[in-house]
Amino acid sequence: MNAGKKRSAWHAAAAAVACMLSLARPGLPHAQEMADAASAAQEVALPADLAKITRDPVAQQARWLRTAAQRGTLAQLDDATLTTLFKALDPLAVPLYIRNGPNGYPSYQFTMVRQERISGKWSDTPDHMLVKTTREPLRVYAKWLPGGAHAGQETIYDTTQRKDEMYGHLGGLLGKIPLWTALDGALARAQSNHQVKDLGTEFITNLYLTEGKKYQEAGVQRPTRVEAKTIGGVRVVALTYETPTGRPQFYAKKEVLGLDLHAPYFRTVESYDNDGRIFERIIIEKIAPATLDDTAFDPKNPDYAF
């Protein structure tokens, strides 16, 4: 039997065993049974070189993750191997890898899909956005793309101009008159629970590191679930963290963070409240460093509709 057939047979056997185990636990919900079966089916024996990594000190594991991401090694692994590897790593390896950074780029642009629960109501249509940003000084240009909620809107935040305000317009025939509004004003809060300056990989990273300290204090030592998967066209290692008390002590009762396979930042986020309802979903579809001069944050840019 060749390697491919062996792996297929192993996966089938693992799934069957997982299903039998779940049938022996009549109180377990059907959805959890299926999740357990899928998780068991994904686990494989690690190659010797990867197994050795999991026995190294945590600092070495974090350094290896950075090298493996940069060289494309992580992206070359199949989902089952990625899942098993990240389950076997020291629980502090990923936080250290993330903390060591870099968690973004000095100047970059990205497209993202964002969906939130605003004032208790889940948005039926997600925002689809193009974002350009520099970090020093902090400047952000955001455009809401066709097909998403609030399509046609544009906004610019430039900390060298006004630190507490952004300049933007609502788009459409009646919304092309630009105006200055507060970063946390009523108009901004009506569309998002976050400020425009929070757009970017750095905000997600900082939130993860801050929450991580609270996870440890609460006895949450490792993710409750690890799974390599593709979300919205983006392949990630999804790390699920569930907290004992949820909000307001923690940002979310359950958080699912999709780790990029090439850099130490997250590409996807799903956040759930204490009742198990999702209140935030983010997918950073494409991201790349970019050279952005002053015109990228100038409302007079001919490519913009201010």
Which functions belong to the PLM regions below?
Residues G27-V113, R117-P126, T134-L138, P146-A149, ...:
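N-terminal leader/targeting segments and the immediate start of mature chains
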Residues Q32, A38-A75, H128-F203, G276-E280:
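An acidic-aromatic
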Residues N2-A14:
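Bacterial N-terminal signal peptides that target proteins for export
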Residues G104-S107, K132-R139, Y157-E165, L259-R267, ...:
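Short, solvent-exposed coil/turn segments at beta-strand boundaries
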Residues A14-A24:
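Bacterial N-terminal signal peptides
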Residues G120-W122, Y141, G152, P178, ...:
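Short acidic, gly/pro-rich beta-turn/loop elements at beta-sheet edges
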Residues M34, V44, A48, L145-G147, ...:
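Gly/Pro-enriched, hydrophobic low-complexity segments
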